[in-house]
């Protein structure tokens, strides 16, 4: 079993499918101090790697949902409440928006939530992009898709297989466009997208890249373009 962290809207979509029955879907509440246009974005309030690290303003409700599925001792050993509460303006909204890959932790380190760094047991890489997780979609352990060319170049130098796609073509209400990494997430052998890739000009390249890495593409809606939902995050219960 694992834990899937999603916005309330996306959690409802996922719960209606029979594809995630082996996992517990957690509907993460909005961040009260964030811009209402992206207050529901999960990756601004939750970080998953060796530990689940939660912003203080959503921790109580998220832990309550986790508690219904697993032991108290497990929660005490795996769940950490962060020091920072995300708030406006930037960069105060992104301390949890950290990209965790198999071998590296990547973020604008001067603004990273201290508990993330404290519990990190892998090399940390400093980049200029504060919205790091929003900008990158992990596809397995050694591959990523990004619409940020600079981040893509950095990840290539670190040995990752990187697909760089065009910016835009991801909806985010109130903004010209959202970020591709924020429109989905990896759950086991599945890459889950909040919307349909057919509306994206790089759809075929993205699909082939996902297939190349032996993942199954799941689209939560076949009638609308991708929507930046602040990522879909996954924590495998078996992670030590």
Question: What residue spans do the PLM features occupy?
Answer:
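The feature marks the mature, well-folded catalytic cores of soluble enzymes
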Residues: 1-240
């Amino acid at each position: 079993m694992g834990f899937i962290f999603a916005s309330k809207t996306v959690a409802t979509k996922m719960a209606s499918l029979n594809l995630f029955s082996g996992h517990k879907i957690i509907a993460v509440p909005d961040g009260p101090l964030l811009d209402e246009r992206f207050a529901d974005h999960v990756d601004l309030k939750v970080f998953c790697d060796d530990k689940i690290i939660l912003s203080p303003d959503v921790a109580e409700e998220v832990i309550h949902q986790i508690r219904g599925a697993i032991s108290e001792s497990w929660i005490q050993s795996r769940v950490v409440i962060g020091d920072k509460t995300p708030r406006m303006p930037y960069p105060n909204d992104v301390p949890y928006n950290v990209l965790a890959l198999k071998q590296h932790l990547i973020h604008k380190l001067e603004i990273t939530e201290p508990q993330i760094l404290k519990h990190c047991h892998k090399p940390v890489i400093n980049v200029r992009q504060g919205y790091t997780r929003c900008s990158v979609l992990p596809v397995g352990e050694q591959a990523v898709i990004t619409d940020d060319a600079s981040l893509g170049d950095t990840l290539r130098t670190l040995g990752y297989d990187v697909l760089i796609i065009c910016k835009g073509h991801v909806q985010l209400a109130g903004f010209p466009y959202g970020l591709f990494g924020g429109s989905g997430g990896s759950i086991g052998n599945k890459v889950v997208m909040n919307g349909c890739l057919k509306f994206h000009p790089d759809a075929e390249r993205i699909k082939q890249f996902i297939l190349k890495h032996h993942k199954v593409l799941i689209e939560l809606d076949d009638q609308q373009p991708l929507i930046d939902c602040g990522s879909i995050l996954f924590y495998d219960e078996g992670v030590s």
